[in-house]
Amino acid sequence: MSQANLSETLFKPRFKHPETSTLVRRFSAGKPQAMQSALSGNHVDHWYRLINRLMWIWRGVTPQEILDVQARIVMSEAERTDPELFDTVIGYRGGNWIFEWAKEAMQWQQKAGQEADPLLSGRHWLHASNLYSIAAYPHIKGDELAEQAQALANRAYEEAAQRLPGSLRELEFTIPGGSPITGFLHMPKGEGPFPTVLMCGGLDSLQTDYYNLYENYFSPLGIAMLTIDMPSIGFSSKWTLNQDTSLLHQHALRHLENVPWIDHTRVAAFGFRFGANIAVRLGYLEPQRLKAVACLGPVVHGLLVDPLHQGRVPEMYLDVLASRLGMHDASDEALRVELNRYSLKTQGLLGRRCPTPMLSGFWKDDPFSPEEESRLITSSSADGKLLEIPFNPVYRNFDHALRQIARWINHRFG
């Protein structure tokens, strides 16, 4: 089936699809507060979703494209779940978040199909994949339209990978007690086996969102990158996040000695946001398999145990947490009790000495991850490095931090 026909089949209207903001029914949703975070985006009045401009632009979407799609959503007069929130248009039609971003993606998909230059075609496919991923954002379980957009993001990513430099292999990992999962191994040019970074992404992202990290930061150093979806989304959708947060990544890590393209003696883990919870946990549980752990804006303790901290983050992020845990109908109190168990300090790990070298980067006044969170990680490591990232200029400092982290990891590979 052609990619165009797949799009038509997946998005063919069959019934009134549930609107994203209604899928998690927490009983005590609070009033949203203004918030700004480099890594997670801004909470802007009249939007349910966090508008994550930094990450979207970093992935290759232009500021103008973001504004154009937002404008189409704002201007829609279609029925909304909440008339106060622009991105709650009901049904797959003009003004609906998923519709507008998928429509943008389809234009790039069409360009990719018409482009004779394989490299340029690959770039267009990658752009389409990024846009489909934003369409599916924040990837809440049970959002049928978003899951269809995820499928298109993955298909477009596979098309892109066939045309872009280096090579990509899909690896299947068997997980005891459940369905296997699929990861993407990105390899630079040259002869393997390659030192490899195991990427642990945020709860609101797909594994296909990190190609730029591989291409611009790891590949130039001759480092491969393995991505795996977080539990409950993408290729890991049949798994629910539980207190053993690193379960899927740990099984993948243990399997790497059987992958001929990977130098399993030189593997590091890199975690964004909640992905840092997985990466740090692996640093404690698998020190013999990891040369280093790096984190950015980690969520490992404070947000998980402090109700005041939880009260400062937007509703969307709490909905994402509830969705990953399979708690779609829970009260905030029940969610708090459960989240407390996900703290690596509560689990008896953080605070104990860890032999694995650990770097943690943070932004001052980050509502998701205060400085103390990163200090807790680095002070627990026998070889810890704290990295403060100035907020402005946000894009340049983010790029500089990623280059520092890539060099630090490469140095730990020896």
From Swiss-Prot:
GO molecular function per UniProt: carboxylesterase activity
Domain of life, source organism: Bacteria
Alphabetized InterPro entries for the sequence: AB_hydrolase_fold, FrsA, FrsA-like, FrsA_esterase
Enzyme kind, highest EC tier: hydrolase
Catalytic activity line of the entry: a carboxylic ester + H2O = an alcohol + a carboxylate + H(+)
TM helices/strands, residue ranges: none
Pfam families cross-referenced by the UniProt entry: FrsA-like (PF06500)
Matches recorded under SUPFAM superfamilies: alpha/beta-Hydrolases (SSF53474)
Keywords tagged on the record: Hydrolase, Serine esterase
Enzyme Commission (EC) number: 3.1.1.1
NCBIfam families linked to this entry: PRK05077.1
Task performed by this protein: Catalyzes the hydrolysis of esters.
HAMAP family documented for this protein: FrsA
Annotated family: Belongs to the FrsA family.
Protein name in UniProt: Esterase FrsA
Organism whose genome encodes this protein: Klebsiella pneumoniae subsp. pneumoniae (strain ATCC 700721 / MGH 78578)
